[in-house]
Amino acid sequence: MTNIRKTHPLMKIINNAFIDLPTPSNISSWWNFGSLLGLCLIMQILTGLFLAMHYTPDTSTAFSSVAHICRDVNYGWFIRYLHANGASMFFICLYAHIGRGLYYGSYMFQETWNIGVLLLLAVMATAFVGYVLPWGQMSFWGATVITNLLSAIPYIGTTLVEWIWGGFSVDKATLTRFFAFHFILPFIITALVAVHLLFLHETGSNNPTGIPSNMDMIPFHPYYTTKDILGALLLILTLLTLTLFTPDLLGDPDNYTPANPLSTPAHIKPEWYFLFAYAILRSIPNKLGGVLALLLSILILIFIPMLQTSKQRSMMFRPFSQLLFWTLIADLLTLTWIGGQPVEHPYIIMGQLASILYFLLILVLMPTVSLIENKLLKW
């Protein structure tokens, strides 16, 4: 009799995706982040669900309901900080996952890559609307500043902003709809994840060499399930350390002050994972130009497969491309740092130079260096 795992309609799907899936034998720990992202998503949905049981999406009670969760609900403080720091872990894994894709040429699986970019945008949207919910000063002013960017759109901008707000300023209607968005988006993300995996399993995984590995595959279980469990334990250890020792390390102290439309915080800034994009936005003196640069800083990922000029898929054997890749990472870290600094000399010019370098590296330098490396292959 055939194993039920291979015949039962539901078990068959799980089997083909996580058990008997043929996997390259040489994928490194950089391939762990996919499963870690799945773990983060499950964790965020569960902690978020328990928070939603006690949270009230109303301007008069939102802030105090979060305080109530932290003070009066059993382990409410723990659930709240797991959720807040879980978002940070989510983005760390997300950026590592994208970085892996860029380095090893995984973007050549175009459908998988494009769904991935869509997932990134959905996660960013979820994190943004979620940050508004505690209704602290940075929640309110972050929502005001970022939604206001849409007013830069010619002709329909102002109407669009007021439509999103549900009034003439960020108020009760805005908070209610942001809570609705924050609740529904993770489930949309889950559906997109299924499509992401569907497309990935059509082609199979890439590997560090970038060379097809069809002749050397091993089953996903037990080899990579074990490896994923190790990654998961390290992720949980990091998250618990962050949550139990320094829960507010990555947060903003301003968010412990209730939202006040009459008092603007000295420095309005988003959470750390958006700072690189915020720095790019601020480095352009024109409002519409800044918004376009902000959008392009993320959407540029869609064009990466079209900018592939190298004859080799992976950067494993391309030292010059590796140098540019790590320059890009350093540039993004610089932008992240500058995004958290006040708008004054020397940060303004540094931000502008870092922003120019970001686009220059992706659009010009990397494709050019790839062509030079192609020439060097003939030597």
Curated annotation (Swiss-Prot):
GO terms for biological process: mitochondrial electron transport, ubiquinol to cytochrome c. Its cofactor is heme b. The keyword Kinase does not apply. One of its GO terms (cellular component) is mitochondrial inner membrane. GO terms for molecular function: metal ion binding; ubiquinol-cytochrome-c reductase activity. Signal peptide: none annotated. The cytochrome bc1 complex contains 11 subunits: 3 respiratory subunits (MT-CYB, CYC1 and UQCRFS1), 2 core proteins (UQCRC1 and UQCRC2) and 6 low-molecular weight proteins (UQCRH/QCR6, UQCRB/QCR7, UQCRQ/QCR8, UQCR10/QCR9, UQCR11/QCR10 and a cleavage product of UQCRFS1). This cytochrome bc1 complex then forms a dimer. This is Cytochrome b. The gene is MT-CYB.
